[in-house]
């Protein structure tokens, strides 16, 4: 129904909309803040700005009948200008939950304030223990690995990277490990992102998609080796701002605190990065084998979500334990062994250096880099392994001088020549020169 002059809103004069007045009244009715062009309410980031556009349309549709899309776009841009705010603080002393705020000292409040992340789960200290969830985990993981998962999921509730770890859950398939991601989605809502760890490293726009996210889940990890690892390593241990790029927007600096949780049938490996730094950032848990003849419950997720308040308390318990341990995760001997296995399988130089019959570590010995590499290639031939470069073998020894009690030198004498090599190692049965 057409409005009459008597019913026109204050911001409309019959021909034009007073944008300043409209935006003031709109923000009084729908309080928001705009940070770097993105709108936030007390419930966190508004992922779909179409919702705001629809609210604007409802306000103006009684006044205007044409050119609505352009007017809505202009008013939305004006609202963002009037709602400007500097970046919201990253708060690690509290968790913003659906029914208020949980403080890390154990207290809580029903008050809500503007925040980067508001979880979609309520804090209910009287929620019962999540029995079905605990049963599910006992069927999925070894008992000694469950505390690790509990601490990591709790770690994902706070916007911090002090733990400096990413978690991999590795199985043969069909165990149900990806159910964990669905449960976390029910707790974190839009503060969780689902994408590929490969994309994070290779797509320059993908890092911006992780801004203001607590968790990124890769529920079917690509087994191909990463061509680079520098972005992933930087994000896992992020302590300062890094460069963000969005399509059509000038790059800017922002701090990421997203954590990585990956499910797959094998470990994350890299084509060229065999450094300890790459593997040190990972925790690898292996699942139990799927029992033969097990009938999967198609309603399992629904049953787990009915316990989400209890699961949240369970995660909080893990978070408090992690903080009490100075952000050092509880890692079982089996998980440590998993990591060593991954390191050896992705870097056969380690296996060669630990082998017998090719080299020997002796304090009063020396060997040229060439002789060591020839011993390594013989080991590769004998073990059907693809050899890495000579530089990679020398680098592995040089980076682990203390571990192997060797010392790099350019003073190894071979056939009257002085060449590069190592003190403290000898080649067993070297081929004649």
Q: What name fits each language-model region?
A:
Residues 12-21, 185-190, 225-242, 394-395:
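A short, contiguous, amphipathic alpha-helix enriched in charged residues
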Residues 1-30, 40, 45-48, 125-139, ...:
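Replication-associated primase and helicase/ATPase modules
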Residues 1-122, 388:
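Intein modules and their embedded homing endonuclease domains
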Residues 212-215, 256-260:
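Loop/turn-to-beta-strand initiation segments
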Residues 188-190, 195-204, 226-229, 243-251, ...:
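Positively charged interface segments
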Residues 305-348:
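Phosphate-handling catalytic cores of nucleic-acid transaction enzymes
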Residues 206-249:
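Conserved nucleotide-sensing/catalytic segment adjacent to the nucleotide-binding pocket
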Residues 27-52, 96-214, 283-285, 312-315, ...:
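P-loop NTPase catalytic core of nucleic-acid-dependent motor ATPases
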């Amino acid at each position: 129904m057409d409005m009459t002059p008597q019913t026109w809103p204050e911001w409309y004069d019959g021909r034009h909309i007073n944008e300043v007045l409209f935006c003031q009244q709109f923000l009084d009715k729908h309080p928001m803040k705009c940070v770097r062009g993105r709108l936030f309410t007390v419930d966190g980031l508004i992922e779909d700005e179409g919702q705001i556009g629809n609210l604007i349309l409802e306000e103006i549709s009684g006044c205007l009948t044409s050119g609505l899309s352009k007017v809505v776009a202009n008013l939305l841009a004006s609202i963002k200008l009037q709602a400007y705010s500097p970046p919201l603080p990253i708060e690690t002393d509290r968790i913003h939950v659906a029914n208020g705020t949980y403080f890390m000292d154990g207290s809580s409040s029903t008050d809500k304030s503007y925040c980067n992340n508001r979880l979609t789960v309520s804090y209910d200290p009287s929620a019962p223990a999540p029995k079905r969830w605990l049963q599910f985990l006992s069927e999925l993981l070894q008992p000694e690995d469950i505390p690790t998962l509990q601490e990591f999921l709790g770690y994902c509730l706070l916007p911090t990277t002090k733990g400096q770890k990413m978690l991999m859950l590795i199985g043969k398939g069909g165990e149900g490990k990806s159910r964990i991601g669905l449960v976390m989605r029910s707790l974190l809502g839009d503060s969780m992102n689902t994408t590929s760890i490969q994309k994070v490293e290779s797509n320059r726009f993908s890092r911006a998609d992780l801004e203001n996210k607590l968790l990124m889940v890769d529920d079917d990890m690509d087994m191909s080796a990463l061509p680079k690892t520098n972005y992933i390593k930087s994000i896992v241990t992020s302590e300062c701002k890094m460069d963000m790029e969005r399509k059509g927007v000038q790059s800017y600096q922002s701090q990421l605190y997203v954590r990585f949780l990956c499910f797959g049938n094998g470990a994350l490996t890299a084509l060229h990065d065999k450094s300890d730094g790459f593997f040190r950032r990972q925790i690898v848990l292996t699942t139990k084998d799927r029992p033969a003849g097990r009938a999967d419950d198609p309603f399992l997720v629904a049953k787990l979500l009915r316990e989400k308040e209890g699961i949240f308390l369970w995660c909080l318990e893990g978070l408090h334990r992690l903080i009490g341990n100075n952000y050092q995760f509880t890692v079982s001997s089996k998980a440590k062994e998993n990591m060593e296995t991954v390191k050896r399988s992705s870097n056969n130089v380690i296996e060669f250096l630990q082998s017998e019959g090719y080299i020997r570590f002796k304090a009063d010995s020396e060997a040229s880099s060439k002789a060591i590499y020839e011993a390594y290639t013989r080991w590769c031939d004998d073990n059907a392994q693809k050899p890495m470069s000579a530089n990679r073998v020398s680098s592995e020894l040089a980076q682990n001088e203390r571990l192997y009690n060797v010392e790099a030198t350019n003073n190894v004498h071979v056939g009257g020549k002085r060449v590069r090599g190592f003190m403290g190692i000898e080649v067993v049965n070297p081929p004649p020169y």
